[in-house]
């Protein structure tokens, strides 16, 4: 440890002398001032000390004969970083490839769905939906666009042949009959309880149950032959098939259920196909057919539900009591 002592230093004293001489006296004065100042001042003494430390050098063990030391003499520098970077790159490429495949498959699926919907909702398929322009056609086209036979146009000799031709055309045109059968029924789903802000949950449930019954009976009804009515008109429309099914079901004791299936949807929906059932001409023809036993339409004895009554009241319809 080095101790540094600091001594107090005094101020130099200046002495002046007056002389009448010239240069010699002035030089002696300067000499005396310098000598007096140097003699009276004392400077501190500084001592320097140095310290040194020994750092040992690390020497790795030799790889010769040591199985626990990897000999990396043949490997390049940064081998570990290269391996880690390669693994990360492979993972990134796998994720990118998965994203490309998923996007492509989703795009193809979307295109196929769009093509399917464009085909299903085209003009030739929209007749099965409630918002179809086919629903705005007159009821005559909905029910009487098939085979029409009248005795005024048929001679007595060709009457049997005309009936056979009508039966053959009825069998061949089974698919158009199915479209005409589904066309008025589709209005029950789209137009029922949708003409006002009031929605009847019970009415929707009843309509769905009636629709399911009618769709279940549709294959059996469409296989029936053409019925010749008393006014010499071939009634192979939906009214004749449903009415004939009601006539056959009366013999089996199902009068009440068939009557509800026929009359209740006609009161709910307001499409042209439903209005045909309530028209005076159809009522007159039904009464004539009822008198001869060809067509029977059973009036429903069940009173309308409160929700249906309110709906008709909001729509301004008169209730039949």
From Swiss-Prot:
**Keywords in UniProt for this one?**
Isopeptide bond, Membrane, Phosphoprotein, Transmembrane, Transmembrane helix, Ubl conjugation
Q: What is its main location?
A: membrane
Compositional bias segments (type: Basic and acidic residues): 253-264, 312-321
Location of Phosphoserine modifications: 132, 282, 285, 291
* Membrane-topology descriptor: Single-pass membrane protein
- Glycyl lysine isopeptide (Lys-Gly) (interchain with G-Cter in ubiquitin) cross-link site: 317
Map out region (Disordered) in residue numbers: 35-59, 241-321
Q: Where are the transmembrane segments?
A: 81-101
* Entry coiled-coil feature ranges: none
Family of this protein: Belongs to the PRM5 family.
Would you tell me the protein name for this molecule?
Pheromone-regulated membrane protein 5
Species annotation? Saccharomyces cerevisiae (strain YJM789)
Its gene name is PRM5
């Amino acid at each position: 440890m080095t101790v540094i002592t600091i001594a107090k230093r005094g101020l130099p004293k200046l002495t002046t002398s007056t002389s009448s001489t010239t240069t010699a006296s002035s030089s002696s004065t300067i000499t005396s001032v310098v000598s007096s100042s140097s003699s009276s001042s004392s400077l501190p003494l500084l001592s320097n000390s140095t310290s040194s430390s020994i750092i040992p050098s690390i020497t790795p063990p030799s790889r010769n004969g040591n199985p626990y030391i990897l000999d990396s003499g043949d490997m390049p520098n940064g081998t570990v970083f290269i391996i880690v970077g390669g693994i990360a790159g492979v993972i990134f490429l796998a994720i990118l490839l998965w994203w490309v495949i998923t996007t492509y498959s989703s795009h193809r699926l979307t295109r196929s769905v769009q093509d399917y919907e464009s085909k299903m909702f085209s003009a030739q398929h929209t007749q099965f939906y409630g918002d179809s322009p086919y629903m705005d056609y007159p009821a005559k086209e909905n029910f009487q666009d098939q085979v029409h036979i009248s005795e005024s146009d048929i001679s007595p000799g060709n009457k049997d042949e005309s009936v056979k031709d009508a039966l053959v055309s009825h069998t061949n045109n089974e698919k158009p009959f199915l479209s005409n059968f589904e066309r008025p029924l589709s209005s029950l789903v789209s137009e029922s309880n949708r003409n006002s802000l009031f929605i009847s949950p019970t009415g929707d449930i009843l309509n769905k149950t009636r629709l399911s019954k009618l769709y279940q009976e549709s294959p059996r009804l469409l296989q029936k032959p053409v019925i010749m009515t008393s006014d010499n008109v071939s009634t192979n429309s939906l009214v004749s098939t449903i009415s004939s099914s009601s006539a056959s079901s009366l013999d089996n004791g199902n009068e009440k259920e068939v009557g509800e299936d026929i009359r209740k949807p006609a009161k709910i929906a307001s499409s042209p196909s439903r209005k045909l059932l309530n028209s005076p001409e159809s009522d007159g023809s039904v009464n004539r057919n009822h008198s001869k036993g060809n067509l029977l339409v059973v009036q429903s004895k069940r009173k309308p539900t409160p929700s249906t009554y309110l709906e008709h009241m909001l729509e301004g319809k008169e209730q039949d009591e």
